[in-house]
Every structure is written in structure tokens, then in C-alpha cells.
Amino acid sequence: MAGNSRRRGAVRKAGTKKGPTVGSGGQRRRGLEGRGPTPPAHLRPNHPAAKRAQSPPRRPAKRTEETETVLGRNPVLECLRAGVPATALYVALGTEADERLTESVSRAADSGISILEVPRADLDRMTGNHLHQGIALQVPPYIYAHPDDLLEAAAGSLPALLVALDNISDPRNLGAIVRSVAAFGGHGVLIPQRRSASVTAVAWRTSAGAAARIPVARATNLTRTLQDWADRGLRVIGLDAGGDTMLDDLDGSDPLVVVVGSEGKGLSRLVRQNCDEVVSIPMAGSAESLNASVAAGVVLAEISRQRRG
């Protein structure tokens, strides 16, 4: 009878090829009451999605800088004379000493830098078989300041004078500008995190040690940082050959950030739009432009002159 739960399942007749087979009649059927809908994948204990959900979150990768190695007797000696922070001086065994090597070893010892004598083959491998003249200096990555640190550096000696670099890719220009900032009473230098020169041993050496005194900060977004500084009371002065204001007419008494563009590209469009003024340097003769570091030095010297009264 239909609906009779005690009714046994179908029974195959005896004598068939497969023989009699007895069904369960529903007696051994697993009960489904109360099980509910199938849970989502991340809630099933053995599902890969659940294991991924239970694992600790991955930390975002941090952008790191590699240690720099300065090669050659003249470059190494210049770095040590300029006070470039270094962790180790490598000298190849059997290297013939001259005045440069002797002075380099002496300066490294006086500065507490480790001096390691290594087989020439090891130094070749460390330097990628580049010309090293038997000596190499290991320089750790530069520790950049935060943009806010530059404002704090200027807080005790207002008015502030900061320099920002736009499209400057040559580390020698960066080092020379840092040197000018130190010479003319500036408080810090701001560079973009991407598409910009960084503080390498070359930049440090060109700064003649000023990089040890003047903080250099990196901005994730240069335009946004300039806008933030403008909101905090700084006037943003762009430096470009096609500027509307001549340097002679610039009022340098206010808190300023001077934005320096490259000699070739000048200021980028967004940076230029966020400048309160764009200043150009009057020049005589047929010269069309100045090197970026030279132009920055001229402007900083004029601002310093005005502030001295």
C-alpha cells in the first residue's frame, strides 16, 4: 500500500539470473531532518576555502632598497671623505696598495667601518665582475624621512624653506640641490617615490656631506603632498623657464616650498597647476636654460638674500 513505511522494498523473484535481492524498504535510510541547506564553502571544515579563511592574512609586500656597493679607488675614497655611511670596506687579498687605498683603509677604521680582506675571486663575484681595482665599499639603503618631518624641522626657525623635486632623475642633481639647501638655510628636500633620483652614494658624495644634515623625504603622491603643505600655510613656488613671475619679483619672506623641474621636461602638468606662482630666472645672452641644480641654487640664494634683509 502506498505510504506504508513498513512495506519492504521490491523483491526480485527467485530463479532470475541475478537471484533474489531484497531492498531496504526505507528502513536504513539516513534521516535528513534538521540538516538545513548546504553551508557555504568557507564554513565547511575540510574545504580549501575554509582553510584559506582560517589562515592568517598576508601582509602587503614592502618596497625595499638594495644595499649599494661602490667600486674603485677614487669613488670609494670620495665617499669616505664625504662621510657616506657605510657598513663594510672590502679589500682583495694581494692588492697593491697606493695612497688612495691606504687612506681609504685609514678613514674606514677611524669611522668604525668593518674592513674585510677577501679573495679576489670573492670580490669579483660580489661585484658582478665589474672593475673594482681591488676595493669596494658597502653602503646601506638611505633612510628617508616622512614629509611631515620636514615641516617639523622648519617649525623652530620659521619661515619654512623646503625644496621639492619633480622629474629629477640624476642623483648628482639631487646631491647638488641638497648641498644648496644646506648652504642657503633650507630645511629639507622632498622627492617622489617613483620616477625620481634617490639618495645613492653618488648623490651623497655630490652633496659634500650635506645629506647628513638635511633630511630627504619621499612622497607617495607629490601633488597631494604639495596640496597638503599649501593647506598648512606654505606657498608653492614652481621653478620653470616658462614661468610668469621673474625671480626679481618673488617675495621670499613667506613660508615657501620651491618645486624644481628638470631641465628638459620642466614641471609636470598637475604639479604646475598646484603652484601659487611659477618663477623663471632672467638670463642674458643665448642661454635657454640652466641645469636644475644650478637653477635651484640661484633661487635659494635670492630667497636667502631677501630673508637676511
Curated annotation (Swiss-Prot):
One of its GO terms (molecular function) is RNA binding. Its EC number is 2.1.1.-. Keywords: Methyltransferase, S-adenosyl-L-methionine, Transferase. InterPro entries: Alpha/beta_knot_MTases, Ribosomal_eL30-like_sf, rRNA_MeTrfase_TrmH, SpoU_MeTrfase, SpoU_subst-bd, tRNA_m1G_MTases_N. The keyword Ribonucleoprotein does not apply. GO terms for biological process: methylation; RNA processing. Coiled coil: none annotated. Pfam families: SpoU_methylase, SpoU_sub_bind. GO terms for cellular component: cytosol. Residues 1-70 are annotated as: Disordered. Belongs to the class IV-like SAM-binding methyltransferase superfamily. RNA methyltransferase TrmH family. This is Uncharacterized tRNA/rRNA methyltransferase MAP_0479.
